[in-house]
Amino acid sequence: VNFYIINATSIAKNDVGNMKVKNTVLQSAFFALANILPIDEAIGYMKKAATKSYSKFGDDVVAQNHKAIELGANAFVKVDVPASWATAEDDKADVQLEGRADTVKVDVPADWKNAGETPAEAPAEGKRADLVDFVNKIVRPVSKMDGDSLPVSAFENMADGTYPQGAAAYEKRGVAVFVPVWHAENCIQCNQCAFVCPHATIRPFAMNAEEAAAAPAQTKFTAKMIGKGCEDLKFTMAISPLDCMGCTLCVKACPTKPEKRAIEMVAQETQLDQQEVFDYAVANVSEKKLPFADSTVKGSQFKQPLLEFSGSCAGCAETSYARLITQLFGERMYISNATGCSSIWGGSAPATPYTVNRESGRGPAWANSLFEDNAEHGLGIALGQKTLRERYIQKVRDLLVRYKEMNVTAEWTGCLEGYLDTLDDAEANAAAVEHMCSMLAEDVARGTCETVPAEREILEGKDYLAKKSIWIFGGDGWAYDIGFGGLDHVLASGEDVNVMVFDTEVYSNTGGQASKASNIGQVAQFAAAGKAIGKKSLSEIAMSYGYVYVAQIAMGADMAQTLKAIKEAEAYHGPSLIIGYAPCEMHGIKKGGMQNCQLEMKKAVEAGYWNMFRFNPAAEGAKLTIDSKAPTGDYQAFITNEARYSRLAQSFPERSKELFAKAEEAAKERYERLVKMAELYKD
């Protein structure tokens, strides 16, 4: 047996400068060792294949892969396997590396002594019995590619197609080579790192004295927690190294000075002890009443994210938006999700990332219908919930009439009136429901009053009493193209639904086909020579109704505007449409890729490629607010920093000049038109 090792991670990170080429390094080492072809010939074939595969992402990516091939062919080290390994008993073994005089200590896993035997896996544990049972009986066998062995009886409790939420928390995939480390002494407690995190793997916690005392010894705290009334609390930022995808967005978002950064990326193995801290905080730290409103970037991140550890790409913009929405409204949220990236990272069986609040047990109710009828599906959910709620509202009204006829105390009539007076105020109504139902439950338990049957009927419908937040999620392929007819119908209906469009300007999930959201000059499938016509103005179409709330957002350009638009849209009594700019792997962002996702949003706004605004029909005074300044950046420099545009210049230089100029002019006209519209909408 010949045993070789190679530090592909180090080569990719330090020598090539692109962590994604680890596989290319390993491939080259394999061909160098296998002798299937002469190594020079193999290198030639590999470079040719790399050029063909990666030219669409630009010359830099091709050059990086070529360098990885060259280095990988020579960077492996042979390890002489000691005969003593056959009967090894020690936890460490001395290993002689070929070409080196010294030896190194290598960990010998205990199960090597019984090679071939799979160690038993400890059963999943947790406070939610239904979820734990689901993970042990279904998630783990399926994850091990053993799903065919499951009997039909294993799905008996899921015959209606429902699955318990939150199974993704049990995966702990540990796929990131580098993860964040938090330096408490440098932290300014802004929570921007958590705000941009696509996978909810970095979270702020405010611990009281008891929680802090019980925390693992390796828990780090700032010297004090900033904020009025927080003097007795301790602030920590907990990180899950086994759930992190290593995207580095948190590091890029940190506003501290580079020489005193509060977060930096380090090797995963150095941070594994922080998993215990994260798990403790998630399971045991209560949500506090803090002086930071959830309408602020800082305050919103103390809310538990109800979308966590999804399978989306590292750096994904879509999950950053969706995670934030669940923090704000997740406990009373319904989601109808179009097929596409957001349905894949949002609902892939068996481990779904949407979860429930630890204290209330409530979370988003998620469903996926077809690609083309998602808007109609969401409207159906809204109308069904509306009908059920109105039925129980009437029962409360009838009971109130009966209470008044019986001359019951003001406390009893007050609890019903408190509910009826807050029907359109989601937060106040949720509190009123809890108060009313607790009183009704007490009366039902006594069982002596003639109103008990009516009270019992109301309690049976408790889940439908509070105001719900209905959301329709989907990408631009759905919203601009395949599902547009349904979306238009739903927006025109006037019903109180919220639509979130993740605009990647391409069919991301199916491999990069052009959509009506794709822009002039963009190269995609079905637009190999660059798209010649402009991007559909979905926002203007929706605004033309006059009664639809419409916003365009870009989280990396303005976190506060993103938060404000989402809050306003949900509070608006009527249909709302939010279009979020979402840089994607398909864009081929140069020099860093998706680790620059949030920065790319900022550049897009500065260059005038993307405009941020809010159109609120219910606003007093100006109804259209432009939140982005007049463009100051270089439009063509921005688009050519992305391979989806730069490869047009490589393939069709003259056509690219024509289309890029056309695209820049269209962007200027779009902003000028927006300014004129803002003037028209002033009272």
What residue spans do the PLM features occupy?
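Short alpha-helices
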Residues: N2-S53
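Short glycine/serine/threonine-rich phosphate/pyrophosphate-binding segments
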Residues: K22-Q27, I344, W478-G486, N509-T510
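Glycine-rich ThDP/TPP pyrophosphate-binding loop and its adjacent helix/strand module
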Residues: V452, I458, A466-I472, D481-D496, ...
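Flexible glycine/proline-rich, aromatic-decorated loop/lid segments
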Residues: V1-A8, E210-G229, Y354-V356, Y507-I520, ...
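Active-site glycine- and acidic-residue-rich loops that bind
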Residues: V61-A63, A184, A314, G477-D481, ...
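General beta-strand structural signal in soluble alpha/beta enzymes
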Residues: Y4-I6, P204, M265, I335-A338, ...
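Ferredoxin-type iron-sulfur electron-transfer modules and their immediate structural context
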Residues: S55-C244, V251-Y334, A338-S469, Q522, ...
